[in-house]
Amino acid sequence: MQIPRLPLVGSPASVGLTFQDVAFASRVDGVPLKGWFIPALGDSVLVIVHGGFQNRVDPTVDTLDLARDLVHEGYDLLLFDLRGRGESGGKGRSLSNIDEDIGGAIDYLKSRGYPTGKIGIIGYCSGAASACLFASRERIGGLVLDGCFTSVKDMVYNQASIRGIPRLPVDVFLPGLELAAKVFYGYEAVNPVDVVRNVQCPVLFIHEEDDDLISTVDDVKLTDTSGNPTNMLWEVDGTVHSKAYQAYPVEYVAKVSEFFRAALMTTGQAGMFSQ
């Protein structure tokens, strides 16, 4: 699916933050990506990976306000546009090569001197799914997955069920749609449930209980499948897909900050998250 390119509305200056405009290349195909580096003078850095139809200024999450709050907690931040979004190059196609864009962001942060164990990722929706895929292949310090689906197929089934569509027609048409998307648009299947067990870093799963896109069963399944008993699932009452921060900003920042303080401190050492 081709993603429309939305303009950036606002900047870190809008919420009182100093920042640097940065640019780096995606892995493999070298698509130019643009973003903001926001310093907090800490020794850890968090990468925010927006949802598929958004850019680094994601109003569904309020990434600028979230950035302000996380900087106040002492975390340096990198917000960037995935390919074909915002000011980045390339064409925006849902779920195609997003993990390589994340890889480019990690490479950039390593070039700034951050060790792997001090880098965390927060991903939303399809950005969460792609972050899970990336972390299943490469070690990072910690991972927060907000609104992550188990598989594209499960997400389609969930949407069909909500709309009263029987499962049989979905079973008939879905394989053909997936094949056409792969042939014509370079779509790559991203199914976190197939790879989450390979994620070696600590993971915090966040699920909004009134989410009409991702079912509660999905995040419970991801947490259980991950196989790490120290991974955590936070089920957020009274809010919808990717809106947990908007609904409960103080609690959200506290939980995410506490998680990363433990994860980024103990990665690679014996500690509460060691496996």
Task: Pin down the residues of each PLM region.
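Short alpha-helix in the alpha/beta-hydrolase fold that links the catalytic acid
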Residues: 201, 215-224
